[in-house]
Every structure is written in structure tokens, then in C-alpha cells.
Amino acid sequence: VPTSISEDVYQSIRFAQLEHCMVVLHGDAGVGKSKGAQKFLKDHPTNAVGISITPSTGTLSSCIKLLARALRVPECRNKMDQMLALRNRLDGTNQVIVIDEAQHLKYAALEEIRSLTDDNPMTGEHGIGVVLIGNSEVYSRLQGRQQAQFAQLFSRIRMQREYTTRKVKPEDVQKLFPVLEDKKAKKDQEFLLSVCRSPWGIRGAMNLYTNAASANDVSYENLYRMAAHMGIGMLSVV
């Protein structure tokens, strides 16, 4: 179900693709960033590719190897040849690369990935769009207030968007829980909105509702009991 945040993520990726630039999408977990990216990748299978970074794949070698596999580019033994192969595959195309959990990327990996947005100085072919998605650590690092190398990277960001749980809208809850909207169960919706706007985010609210639905009781009282049972705790109603 598209929400205001996942739709904004979708359009931001499209912007990076059209402008061949770097975009950073960051913020709280569980608000729909990855869902928006997944929808874009599904809708554009021929000119969009996504990879997800972990602490063990954040190095330059691991990152470009993941990218090569995603693009079906033959893997090379050294990093220079691998980057040349990637550029040969990407330059002049309308590809966009979406990197989730980008806060795990090391500086060298960030710099190489960013370079893919540059025009090729030899052929003049334009670069591609790159989208970094992660928690706000990725943007804080790129701001580089204390590290000149990150400050240089920061200056190449065309657009950044911050998504927090507080930005979840009542309309999002109506879309996510249509049964409650049909029943005009305002108290239930307000409670789920309070969960969405808490550190548990949309993901937490969805899990809460799913558990309540499994018990065949999505009443306000049962949602509240289920929240306490799940450790979500006492939340004030918005």
C-alpha cells in the first residue's frame, strides 16, 4: 500500500534517474523508505537496480562486486577493472542505482559509487542516477563537518530527503488499514497513528494490526492490549 512517504521515495528515485545525480533519502526505520524503493525497482526492471549493504559488504571491493552481480557484469579480479566494466555498462544509459542500508558504506565505496553520476570525461556520455537510502547516519557522515573528505562528497548531493515517524499522516493510516476506515473506527485509527508516529513506525503498526487480526479482534481494546503484549507500551493517542 503506497503511503505519503513511500510515494515521495518513489518520486525522488525518479528524479535521480532523470537528472543523473546523487540523492540521499534518510531517516527513521520502518516508515516506508525501502517499500518505496522496492516499488520503483519492480516498476522499472530494465533501468533500475538495487543492492542492500550490510556491515560486511560496505567496503569498496564488496560493494562493487554486489553491483556487478546485480547488473550481470562479469566480475573482475581487481577494483580498477571492475569499475571500468561497470562504467562501460552504465555510461550513457538511464539506469539508476538504489543502495539500501547505505550507512554501512565505507568512504572509498561512497566515493566510487558517487563517481558513477559524473559524465565520462573521455566520451562525454552522461553518468547515471544514484540513490542512497539509510538511517540519518548516512547523511550526517556525508555532511562531514569534521572530515573534509566527506564534506567533498556532501557537495555533490543534488537532493536529500529526511523521513521521520512524525511525518506519517492520518491519510496513510486510512490507506494502510482500509477495514478500519470502512468502519469509521476513528479511535482505532488514532491509536494506530500514534504507533506509526512512535519509534516503532509504520512497520510496528502493521505488525500490531496483523497480530490483532490473527486473533479476529481489531477493536481498540484488543489493539491496546496487543501493543502492551508486544512491548510497544503505553502510547498517548494523537
Feature-to-residue mapping (PLM):
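Pre-Walker A adenine-sensing motif
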Residues: 2-17
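Sensor-1/coupling segment of RecA-like P-loop NTPase cores
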Residues: 24-29, 105, 119-149
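Conserved AAA+ ATPase "SRH/arginine-finger" region at the nucleotide-binding site
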Residues: 51-56, 141-145, 157-171
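Conserved Walker B catalytic segment
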Residues: 7, 91, 96-98, 103-133
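Walker A/P-loop nucleotide-binding motif
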Residues: 18-39, 55-56
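C-terminal alpha-helical "lid" subdomain
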Residues: 42, 152, 159, 163-238
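Conserved alpha-helical scaffold flanking the Walker A/P-loop in AAA+ ATPase domains
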Residues: 76-95
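Conserved NTP-binding/hydrolysis module of P-loop NTPases
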Residues: 59-77
